[in-house]
Regions:
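Hydrophobic beta-strand segments
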Residues: 56-57, 74
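Short acidic/proline- and small/hydrophobic-mixed sequence motifs that coincide with surface turns
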Residues: 50-54, 69
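Low-complexity, acidic Ser/Thr/Pro/Gly-rich terminal tails and inter-domain linkers that flank the onset
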Residues: 1-43, 47, 121-158
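Short, solvent-exposed, Trp/other aromatic-anchored flexible loops in extracytoplasmic proteins
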Residues: 64, 68-137
């Protein structure tokens, strides 16, 4: 059965992993239009200098009460993510008929030109919270771009 998914929620990563060739960028929760199922999609960026051919991540999805709905590994295989490329947002790592409230992500291993790189020892560095734009500026920006989600001061996302 074909079904379309629409964006329910999107959250950027609140940290980066200093020195890692791969950065976690955001998590998106999408809702199926016919079944109501929630798909969890993760987005990553190759910030290294070599093509990324694979990535293994560990994720944990929780409900509003903090109960674990799913904990598993996901394998992004046969990638050809060149330096600077963003990937993963079109792969659902988990589909649930129960609402998902939070997702925790840990990067495990990257494959750069087939060579495995352990990502578990890279330290997380917390990012500053986005600053909210004054209402009039946000409204003007939204009108000019046609994007109502533009409510915060743009941040440098180059790591």
């Amino acid at each position: 059965m074909d079904q379309n998914f629409s964006l329910m929620a999107q959250s950027r990563a609140n940290y980066y992993t200093a020195g890692s060739p791969v950065q976690f960028v955001r998590v998106e929760l999408l809702k199926g239009d016919t079944t109501g199922e929630v798909a969890v999609c993760l987005t990553f960026k190759n910030v290294g200098t070599e093509p990324l051919t694979g990535l293994v991540v560990h994720f944990k999805c929780k409900d509003a009460a903090g109960q674990v709905l799913c904990e598993d590994d996901f394998y992004y295989e046969q990638l050809n993510a060149q330096p600077g490329a963003v990937f993963g947002s079109d792969d659902a790592v988990y589909v649930s008929d129960t609402p998902v409230s939070s997702v925790e992500v840990e990067q495990d291993r990257a494959f750069l030109n087939g060579r495995g790189v352990d990502l578990r020892n890279y330290k997380r560095v917390r990012l500053n919270m986005p600053r909210v734009l004054p209402g009039s500026i946000a409204k003007t920006l939204q009108q000019r771009t046609g994007n109502v989600q533009l409510t915060c001061v743009p941040q440098d996302t180059e790591y």
